[in-house]
Regions:
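Short His-centered aromatic/hydrophobic patch
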Residues: 171-174
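Nucleotide-sugar donor phosphate/pyrophosphate-binding loop at the beta->alpha transition
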Residues: 57-63, 149-151, 196-215, 248, ...
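A short, active-site helix/loop in glycosyltransferases that binds the activated sugar's phosphate group
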Residues: 221-296
């Protein structure tokens, strides 16, 4: 398995849809997604949002975001599909084609959204992984819902992935999926990427279900993080908590991996690669945006306000975003 250097919103209870065909101008046709994807992305949210127009009609619109932008060309080239929640509880849209990829909605009930997503994912894992001032909340019912929903994602992925296909599971909401999917489809190659920090042993040990999470991630062939120290944290956990042999390699060097030896039988092991893959920047897109007339006009206004400096730089500081409010 290889992984490139690439790496939602609140549901509206009034939105309702019963099929994959929207009623807006951008209506879509449903398809059979069984064993369709040579390259399958599994994420909590879809790359498209179900929106309600002013006239009451509903349609699917492409979601903004770096992951969608980065993966779309790969999905088109490799007959890809994307499994995710459509962002609206208690609906069951059918799979459909959009922009050269197969979109496979996975329905979640209102209770599952509350317990699996708002509860365990965002009130347990998010503050724990970020070491927030606000302490995580640990609830057994949230954990059971997390297990149940992860199982459903894994089962749907097993149905959609083509024989010997590649499945890329994304982020903290779905950390049990790799192991579950491996049990269902040992033929596929599985990658997992975490889009948030991975905590050190001292923090992770607070989690009552820490061993289950570690085993879930080790179901993958390749586990990726943004930064080298996140990868090192994970490897250390596998050694201390699960007693697996590890080889750190040169995780700090691009293109190099550490490895974890996962026992699969008497004197047999499966190697799980661990590495850091920081997301890249779409430079051509930003360059094109900077050349737009509206942007250049606003730039001139700012220059005048700042005393006409020779050079002007724009910075966006993520630390201004409240860390306890995941999207």
């Amino acid at each position: 398995v290889t992984m490139s250097d690439i790496g939602g919103g609140q549901p509206n209870k009034d939105d309702q849809v019963t099929s994959g065909v929207s009623t807006g101008e951008n209506a879509v046709e449903t398809v059979d997604a069984t064993k369709c994807a040579d390259f399958l992305v599994v994420a909590n949210r879809l790359p498209t949002d179900l929106v309600t127009n002013k006239d009451g009609s509903q349609e699917w619109k492409r979601s903004p975001g770096g992951l969608v932008t980065a993966l779309e060309p790969i999905l088109k080239k490799n007959h890809g599909a994307w499994i995710g929640w459509p962002g609206v509880p208690d609906v069951s849209p059918e799979p459909f084609e959009q922009d050269g990829k197969t979109v496979v909605p996975l329905a979640l009930s209102a209770d599952e959204v509350q317990n699996y997503y708002e509860g365990f994912s965002n009130d347990t894992l998010w503050p724990l992984y970020h070491n927030c001032i606000v302490p995580p909340t640990y609830r057994e019912d949230w954990w059971r819902s997390y297990q149940k929903v992860n199982r459903r994602f894994a089962e749907r992925a097993a149905e959609v992935a083509a024989p010997n296909g590649i499945v890329w599971v994304n982020d903290y909401q779905l950390q049990l999926v790799p192991q579950m999917l491996r049990e269902l489809r040992p033929d596929v190659r599985i990658g997992f990427f975490l889009h948030i920090p991975f905590p050190p042993l001292e923090l992770f040990d607070q989690l009552p279900w820490r061993d289950e999470i570690i085993d879930g991630l080790l179901g993958a062939d390749l586990v990726g993080f943004h930064l080298p120290h996140d990868a090192v944290n994970f490897q250390r956990l596998t050694f201390v908590r699960r007693k697996h042999a590890i080889t750190r390699g040169q995780i700090n060097t691009p293109g190099h991996y550490g490895e974890v030896a996962v026992p699969i039988g008497d004197n047999e092991f499966r190697s799980v690669r661990v590495g850091a893959f920081p997301i890249s920047i779409d430079s051509p897109r930003f360059n094109a945006t900077a050349r737009q007339q509206s942007v250049r006009r606003r730039s001139r206004e700012l220059r005048q306000t700042l005393g006409n400096p020779e050079k002007m730089a724009l910075g966006v500081d993520l630390s201004l975003i409240h860390i306890s409010e995941p999207t």
